[in-house]
Each structure stands twice: as C-alpha cells, then as structure tokens.
Swiss-Prot record:
EC number: 6.2.1.48
Keyword tags: Ligase
Reactions it catalyzes: 4-(trimethylamino)butanoate + ATP + CoA = 4-(trimethylamino)butanoyl-CoA + AMP + diphosphate; crotonobetaine + ATP + CoA = crotonobetainyl-CoA + AMP + diphosphate; (R)-carnitine + ATP + CoA = (R)-carnitinyl-CoA + AMP + diphosphate
Protein's name in the database: Crotonobetaine/carnitine--CoA ligase
Organism: Salmonella choleraesuis (strain SC-B67)
InterPro entries named among the record's database cross-references: AMP-bd_C, AMP-bd_C_sf, AMP-binding_CS, AMP-dep_synth/lig_dom, ANL_N_sf, CaiC
Gene3D superfamilies: 3.30.300.30, N-terminal domain of ligase-like
Length: 517
C-alpha cells in the first residue's frame, strides 16, 4: 500500500504552506523561556531561505551537511532546506565529543557543518586535522569568531530569497538523511533514510496516535534523534497539527508547558516518566488536555498504572528503532492496553519471532523479534558504506533482525523480553536485565536502576545492580537483597549493588552500560 504517492519533502512543504497558510506550524521554547512561533507559510519561507543559503555555499544534490545542534528552529530550517535541494542531512548527537564527532564527519565525508557557538571550539580543533573533510562552518549565535571558513547563519539566511532558487529533480527514493545510531556498545552505523521513509513516517505515526490538524504535539526529545523526527515532527506536520519543540526537558516545568501550549499529545522516555512521578503531587496534575503519551521501553506495569492514574492520561506503547524509522509494534488507537504487551504490528509491516536458526517460532516461545518491511520505504534503506553490516541485519526479502528477544501470544500481541546482547548468562541460565530492572524499580526508595553482567570465574557472569535513590532516601545492602530475594527467583538475585548519584546516559536516555562494567 503506497500512502506517499510519489510526494517528496519539497512537494510536501509547498503543499502544506498552501493548505494551512497562517495556521501555527511550529512553536519553540528555549531554556530561558524565549518563544519563537512560525505559521506553515512562514516556516516554508524560512526553509526556502535556508535551502538557498546552502546553495550559495556550494551545496548541491547528494552533498552531505552535518548539523550539531540542540533543539532549535534552525534545525527544522536546515533539515527540510537540505531536503528541498536534494542534499543530505547528517545530524550529530549534540552530546558527542570531538573524537566521536570527527569520526562521523570523516565517515560521511561532510564538507559543511551547521552548529552553535558553544560547540565551535571543538570543531575549530577538528579543522586543524588535515585529514578532515570539513572545510566550512556555519555558526548560529552571537559573538562569532572572525576565523576563515566560518560564516554567520542568521546573516546569510536573511539575505536569501523566500523563493527556492535551485530545484533539482527529486525522487522519493533519494536519500534525505544519514542518521548515526547511538553506538552504546560499538562504533555507530549510519542509517540511510530516504524521502519516502520520512513521508511514510509522517502518515504512519499520525495514524498510530489518531493525529488531527487541531492537535498540538509537544516534545522535548532531541531533534537529532529518530523519535523526535519520525514520531513527533513528521506526523505533526503531515497532519497539519501544531508542533511544539522545547529546547530541554525539565520535570518541574513540564506540566506547566503542557498547559501553556494546550498540548494534546506528547512522548516520553522512562526517565521522564519516573522523574515526573517524583515531583510533588499538585491539584493541577490532571488539569491539562493531553490525551496520549507515547512512550518507549522500558517501564514496569506498576509504573505505567501509577502514571496513568495520577495524571489521567493514556500511555501508548511504541516499539521500534532507528532502522525501523517508526514504532512498528505498538498500541493502536482505541485499543485496550494489554500490558506488559508492547502491542501489535502496525499496517505495512509483518513481524515474527525466530529462533537461532532463523526459523519462525510458535506463540509463547522466546526468540528474536524480526520485522518485514520495504527497504528505503517502510524501513531504512541500508547502513551507509557498510554492505556487510547491512547484509547481517537485513535479509533480501526485507526481513530486519532487530537483535531483541521477545515472544507473541495467540492473539498476535508481542512481548519484549530484552536486547539479545542484554541477557546475562549466569550458571547456565539466561537472565533478562530488563526483567530485573522492572522488578527492582518497584522498590519505593529507588528512582533509577540498571543491572549488568560482570565476569565470574564460576558462573560465567555475576549480576551487579547500579542504583539511584530518591532524594533523601537511604538503602542498606541487607534491605536491597532482601527485597530481591522476595520478588525474584534465586538465580536472578544480584550478587552486588552500588548506589550512585546518577547513571551514564546518551542523549536518548539510554543507559551506556559499557561505562559501568
């Protein structure tokens, strides 16, 4: 089923500007509370000016341009401005350091970077390396350096026409983006995303949450991440909704922002839900317009129930990854939630549970979650310049091996068990880290928890728990181990525990376990 109809991103924005005109498309709120607002027509003009800016700097169809930015309107201008001229966006995780960022520039052969003043010292140093392909930096901010090869984004953009001056032929099969995975365990891989992928994501995710043009979709997810792009921005714009982008997440400010912008839909990661739950209860907890909160793994059933009861919202499970573009398994509009199920497979996809020999498994048996889509359309096209990695993950028939363990029931509902690489082998038993984390997170004194496997000469691996306590709480080892022994099988009880003030995370909220082992 082709729901895109051959429409690329340039055509999308021209149509949106014509249909919705003065309707509010984008609202941005900075950490300082400064608000910038754009209608569909004015946002399209900003996108056109930015496209012309890139053209004036020599960027043509197929060229790659990196963005190293925190959430800001300029990210949206650049994303779609590049797409309009057939160039390719390479977003860089704003938390990456010099060596990691330089590796992405080199790997994708980026010659032009758009970044903010705060990140410039790092890139000034990178440019001193003669091997870097980077030869020009376009800076956003004030007090810009007078260095060679550096230009002022706002000044350049203001000089450009609001009418697009370069319109190469575009196909929905053209690459729009190379999005590097988080790389929590190894070097990141560049996920190639097409115009079709992004257009499909808009329609699919809008269907998933029954989005309408009178909805307001608010997010604090980083714009350089697939979740913000494909489950928030693309569906909001595709449906003609208003997209509210916040610069940073604040648990204290979150509900005030929800009320201020009359948000009807938002998305959360578990860390956000947990920090919202530890905020003092208030009479205004249910005074909002939110009808759906899309969330991503992992939360225990107790946490989900407590959140929905306190704030009076519906939690909508969405399971996916960068390679699937969208949440290909999840709750459907109007469905009764069947927790701990992660939902059913969405339209345009197939899903199976397979064993280690790549054979389908019957209901109830745990194996690898495999997804069938169309490369370059409903799932990613390939890993950039990595044919072996592509072949290892993606079968010729379109089956994607997710690397996740799960099972399905007789009714077609899927259940996530763990990342296959996130299983601890303990004395012949496979122990799911997620299962233990969900159990331990129910302890009233514990705010955050992660378990890892550490080498053990006798049992292959021992289990260690890293814990963050709620403010003002104390927890003895005896109390912790007693809780575990009363709530899980003996072979699953951790051997060690360590209390920390925080846990290392990447920009997406994923815990970087390699920093804990």
């Amino acid at each position: 089923m082709d729901i895109v109809g051959g429409q690329n991103l340039r055509q999308m924005w021209d149509d949106l500007a014509g249909v919705y005109g003065d309707k509010t498309a984008l609202i941005f709120e900075s950490c300082e509370g400064i608000v910038r607002q754009f209608s569909y027509a004015s946002l399209n003009e900003e996108i056109n000016r930015t496209a012309n800016l890139f053209y004036s700097l020599g960027i043509r169809k197929g060229d790659r341009v990196a963005l190293h930015l925190d959430n800001c309107p300029e990210f949206i201008f650049c994303w779609f401005g590049l797409a309009k001229i057939g160039a390719i966006m390479v977003p860089i995780n704003a938390r990456l350091l010099g060596e990691e960022s330089a590796w992405i520039l080199q790997n994708s052969q980026v010659s032009l970077l758009v970044t903010s003043v705060q990140f410039y010292p790092m890139y000034r140093e990178i440019r001193q390396d003669n091997s870097t392909p980077l030869n020009h930096i376009c800076l956003i901010g004030e007090q810009l350096p007078a260095d060679d090869g550096v230009s002022h984004f706002s000044q350049l953009q203001a000089r450009q026409s609001a009418t697009l001056c370069y319109t190469p032929a575009l196909s929905t099969d053209d690459t729009a983006e190379i999005l590097f995975t988080s790389g929590t365990t190894s070097r990141p891989k560049g996920v190639v995303i097409t115009h079709y992928n992004l257009r499909f994501a808009g329609y699919y995710s809008a269907w998933q949450i029954a989005l309408r043009d009178d909805d307001v979709y608010m997010t604090v997810m980083p714009a350089f991440h697939i979740d913000c792009q494909c489950t928030a921005a693309m569906p909001a714009f595709s449906a003609g909704s208003t997209f509210v982008l916040l610069e940073k997440y604040s648990a204290r400010a979150f509900w005030d922002q929800v009320r201020r912008y009359q948000a009807t839909v938002t998305e959360c990661i578990p860390m956000m839900i947990r920090t919202l739950m530890v905020q003092p209860a208030a009479p205004t907890d249910r005074q909002h317009h939110l009808r759906e909160v899309m969330f991503y793994l992992n939360l225990s059933a107790q946490e989900k129930d407590a959140f929905t009861e306190r704030f009076g919202v519906r939690l909508l499970t969405s399971y996916g990854m960068t390679e699937t573009i969208v949440g290909i398994i999840g709750d459907r509009p109007g469905d009764k939630r069947r927790w701990p199920s992660i939902g059913r497979v969405g339209f345009s996809y197939e899903a199976e549970i397979r064993d280690d020999q790549n054979r389908p498994l019957p209901a109830g048996e745990i194996g690898e979650i495999c997804i069938k889509g169309i490369p370059g359309k409903t799932i990613f096209k390939e890993y950039y310049m990595q044919p072996e990695a592509t072949a290892g993950a993606l079968e010729p028939e379109g089956w994607l091996h997710t690397g996740d363990s799960g099972y399905q029931d007789e009714d077609g509902y899927f259940y996530f068990v763990d990342r296959r690489c996130n299983m601890i082998k303990r004395g012949g038993e496979n122990v799911s880290c997620v299962e233990l984390e969900n159990i331990i997170s129910a302890h009233p004194k514990i705010q955050d928890i992660v378990v890892v496997g550490i080498k053990d000469a006798i049992r292959d691996e021992a289990i260690k728990a890293f814990i963050v306590l709620n403010e003002g709480e104390t927890l003895s080892e005896a109390e912790f181990f007693s809780f575990c022994e009363n709530n899980m099988a003996k072979f699953k009880v951790p051997s060690f525990m360590e209390i920390r003030t925080d846990l290392p995370r990447n920009c997406s909220g994923k815990i970087i376990k390699k920093n804990l082992k």
